[in-house]
């Protein structure tokens, strides 16, 4: 049986480190990747849309900033309800603090 371990990345107003991290995770064949836009605003929509459309990330959005804890809870609930064979989750920060080597 194949198990699922989603990688959850909450993000508020991401910089270039988030797309870089996602590309590295995809190259390492680590997925699914669930990103929570925690109320970043319209000026960041393009970054999130690209990650969803071009890199296959699952994008969850909060209309306003609710904080990292609420963003994680939102993603955990999504994963519990959508990944049948999930055995756990990995969380990573969008600023590149956690490397692919650390995550893997």
Question: Which residues fall in each region the model found?
Answer:
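Structured catalytic core of nucleotide-sugar glycosyltransferases
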Residues: 1-104
């Amino acid at each position: 049986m194949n198990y699922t371990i989603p990688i959850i990345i909450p993000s508020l107003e991401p910089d270039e480190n988030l797309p870089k991290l996602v590309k590295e995770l995809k190259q390492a064949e680590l997925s699914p990747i669930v990103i929570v836009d925690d109320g970043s605003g319209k000026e960041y929509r393009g970054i999130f849309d690209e990650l969803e459309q071009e890199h296959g990330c699952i994008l969850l959005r909060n209309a306003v900033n609710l904080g990292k804890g609420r963003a994680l809870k939102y993603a955990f609930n999504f994963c519990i309800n959508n990944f049948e064979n999930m055995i756990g989750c990995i969380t990573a920060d969008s600023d590149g603090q956690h490397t692919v080597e650390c995550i893997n």
